[in-house]
């Protein structure tokens, strides 16, 4: 399952680690391919049936979920992960049990679309097709494609790498659709918008969600453009999840992002929670805000606001005029390493540490190994933080770019 727990049931492995990081040149026999497809089909059936079972009475049926999964999945398949999940969800005092209950407070249609697209399409069905495509073409196939719909932004945050591209670049609607069309053929059903501020293009983004209801779309956003009308659109399309930038207390947040931004973010979260829509928080930690974002108060606050996940990135100076003073020092990074893990095992929110959780995803995931990045000019980067490109989406397809080992 995509969010499978490790053997201690205190942390969660990223969905990106569903299949092991084997060399692309590794070849499997037809028998093994059939076995893998059988596993994927069995898991998909188990997940689909299990989700329907949970809908009837989540609080009563969550502890019984693995009994149902066991009926579909043969002995020995993902056994340690299944046992770890079983141990976690049978404890009603565990943070994971509480997080699952929070998910069942969401709008039912949105929740069903998320489970179907994220678990079945992106992580089970998609994984099998990704592996098959990778072997046939001797290349990496990404689990997720990150793309910048626009370089435009309505804020001017200190140290933001996106500003180095200016504010006039855009991937047009047809180009984004083409990327999604080609990605689906490779088994990629997860698309993540970066920027710029993606919601500058929110009408186009909703049209894309509507056109590809079998894909899940996540967007990093400053949250200031989320309003009542947009919440209604999210309810309509059902497959869009915002990750809202928040960097601690009001003072810490507005010190880098601008005066008044914190209150606008609070308003956006209130709207999303009121409409029972899923969202998370994206936090860039710097030398200036480490104490704020590592505090228990910060975690409790974003949980109260309705966030289901929080994704941490440490500040990385990029570009000629980057503010290097904001880089966290080694002691601050170590502090965040331990704090994120502490709260991940105790709080009803899924915490992720982009730079320091490499152990759960087999190391670096860039270069199409699990993801790649397409900027608003169409340039394809191996990583959102590494702005070097030898390919452009206007000149090559994603598969051709993968074959070139970008």
Model feature map: region roles:
Residues 12, 143, 368, 384:
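Exposed loop/turn and edge beta-strand positions of beta-sandwich/beta-sheet ligand-binding modules
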Residues 8-22, 405:
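Short, small-residue-biased leader/transition segments that mark boundaries at the very start
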Residues 30-83, 87, 254-367, 373-381, ...:
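Radical SAM enzyme [4Fe-4S]-AdoMet core and its adjacent flexible, acidic
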Residues 1-8:
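Right-handed beta-helix
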Residues 21-25, 398-403:
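Short, compositionally biased segments
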Residues 20, 153, 157-160, 364, ...:
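Short cysteine clusters
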Residues 63-229:
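Conserved alpha-helical substructure of the radical SAM core
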Residues 173-193, 199-313:
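Radical SAM/AdoMet-radical enzyme domain recognition
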């Amino acid at each position: 399952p995509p969010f499978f727990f490790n053997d201690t049931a205190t942390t969660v492995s990223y969905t990106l680690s569903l299949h092991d990081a084997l060399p692309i040149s590794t070849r499997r026999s037809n028998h093994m391919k059939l076995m893998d497809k059988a596993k994927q089909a069995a898991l998909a059936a188990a997940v689909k049936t299990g989700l329907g079972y949970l809908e009837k009475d989540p609080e009563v049926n969550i502890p019984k979920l693995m009994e149902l999964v066991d009926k579909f999945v043969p002995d020995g398949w993902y056994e340690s992960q299944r046992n770890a999940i079983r141990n976690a969800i049978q404890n009603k005092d565990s943070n994971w049990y509480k997080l699952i209950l929070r998910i069942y407070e969401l709008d039912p249609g949105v929740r069903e679309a998320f489970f179907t697209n994220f678990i079945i399409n992106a992580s089970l069905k998609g994984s099998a097709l990704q592996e098959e495509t990778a072997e046939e073409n001797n290349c990496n196939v990404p689990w997720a494609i990150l793309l910048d719909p626009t370089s435009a932004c309505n804020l001017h945050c200190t140290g933001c790498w996106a500003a180095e591209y200016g504010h006039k670049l855009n991937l047009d609607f047809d180009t984004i659709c083409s990327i999604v069309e080609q990605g689906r053929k490779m088994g990629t059903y997860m698309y993540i918008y970066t920027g710029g501020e993606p919601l500058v293009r929110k009408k186009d983004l909703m049209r894309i969600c509507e056109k590809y209801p079998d894909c899940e779309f996540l967007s990093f956003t400053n949250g200031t453009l989320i309003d009542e009308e947009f919440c209604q659109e999210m309810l309509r399309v059902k497959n869009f999840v915002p990750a809202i930038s928040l960097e601690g207390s009001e003072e810490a947040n507005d010190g880098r992002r601008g005066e008044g931004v914190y209150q606008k973010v609070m308003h956006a979260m209130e709207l999303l929670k009121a409409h029972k829509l899923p969202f998370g928080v994206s936090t860039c930690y710097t030398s200036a805000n480490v104490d704020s974002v590592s505090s228990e108060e910060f975690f409790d606050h974003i949980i109260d606001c309705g966030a289901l996940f929080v994704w941490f990135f440490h500040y990385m100076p990029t570009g000629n005029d980057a503010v290097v003073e904001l880089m966290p020092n080694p002691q601050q990074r170590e502090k965040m390493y331990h704090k994120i893990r502490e709260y991940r095992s105790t709080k009803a929110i899924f915490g992720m540490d982009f730079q320091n959780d490499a152990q759960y995803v087999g190391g670096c995931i860039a270069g199409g190994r699990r993801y790649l990045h397409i900027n608003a000019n169409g340039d394809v980067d191996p990583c959102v933080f590494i702005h070097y490109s030898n390919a452009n989406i206007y000149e090559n397809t994603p598969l051709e770019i993968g074959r070139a080992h970008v």
